[in-house]
Amino acid sequence: MWLEKYRRNRSIDETSDDSYEPFLSASELEEADEKALGTKRNRRRRFSYFTCGTLWGSTFLFLLLLFSIIFSIVRSFWGVEEDPDSIFTGWGKDGSGTESLAWYPTDFLRDVTPVPCHSHNDYWRRIPLFSALRVGCVGVEADVWLFGNSSELYVGHDRAALTPHRTLQSLYVNPLVDIIERNNPQTPFYNSSGTHRGVFDTDPDQTLVLLIDIKTDGAKTLPQVEAQLEPLRARDWLTYIKDGVIHERPITVVGTGRTPFDMLMQNSTYRDIFFDAPLKELYEDPNIPDTGENNEPYVYNRTNSLYASVNFRRAIGSVWTDLSEGQLRLIRGQIKGAHKRGLKVRYWNTPAWPVIRRNKIWHTLMAEGADILNVDDLKAATRKRW
């Protein structure tokens, strides 16, 4: 009878993995059932732990990736860049040799490739001139002030920013003389006599534009600017025009601000300061084909000017998302007129924020034919081609 009972129980309940033993006591049967149930619970628990661990790990990795993407977008949006002055951490410190501006590091220019950018308000940078050169800018800007009977030209954005030691000589002329002298050495292997290697070792023929923005009376200040440039002129390092022929040199000086155009033109045989022409006045309809004919000589041309510049915000207007067709037509007409006269186009006071809009405007200007970017953010302007 026990055999029939065993078979009947086996057919009714096969939920347990352990074979039913008819000879076990009731307590032993309960203990066996509890062990089987515990085994199943352990298996479920291990599976739950594995599933939860996988989900938590995947969530953590996803959040980490998401944070990295958001961080990159924020850096791009806000224009967070590396500091180009980081190599000058010892500048001006005791024992560095820079206390009196007697030492200038030229080694940092050996691997620098020139980039068509202009360092706007360059004197605001931690290391004027050198910060711009380090990233490859081919133009720097200095605002100069003349006071009373002094012959010194002080450099700064306004009167409150001027100091006795920040002058055109100390910040620009003397450092440029030192850099170019080192790039034109007198050695048994190289005779620097009559050579004109510029500041960039990778492109020694590239001229550096020194844009001098005269802030005080032009008629009184311009003669002092000419006098302050004598160390460069005496070494034949200033681009000049003589008898109608332009001679390119390592430094090209351009006068802007209150620079008097009529005074620059007084010497018809020799000039080594060029004018920053008013770009807005050079507009020509971009939709009219250029026949190449010109019945009258241009007032502003390559013999007296280099740049043709304008305040972007005033000449073109505000930009919200993209440049309008009307704004593009203005830009094309101004660029057409400047290039027809052999001048380089420079827009200043372009929108600086948000960075996405700024970059789009930079790209559009260069695509339309602008020759140089007028920038405050050196790293962003030189990290890619526009």
Features from the language model and the residues they span:
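Catalytic cores of phosphodiester-bond hydrolases, prominently lipid phosphodiesterases
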Residues: 1-114, 149-386
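Short alpha-helical segments and helix-capping/turn motifs at coil-helix boundaries
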Residues: 124-127, 237-239
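Short acidic, Gly/Ser-rich segments with clustered Asp/Glu that frequently serve as metal-coordination loops
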Residues: 139-151
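Asp/Glu-centered strand-loop micro-motifs enriched in Gly/Pro and often flanked by an aromatic residue
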Residues: 118-123
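Non-catalytic positions within long, well-ordered alpha-helices that form the structural scaffold/packing
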Residues: 133-134, 366
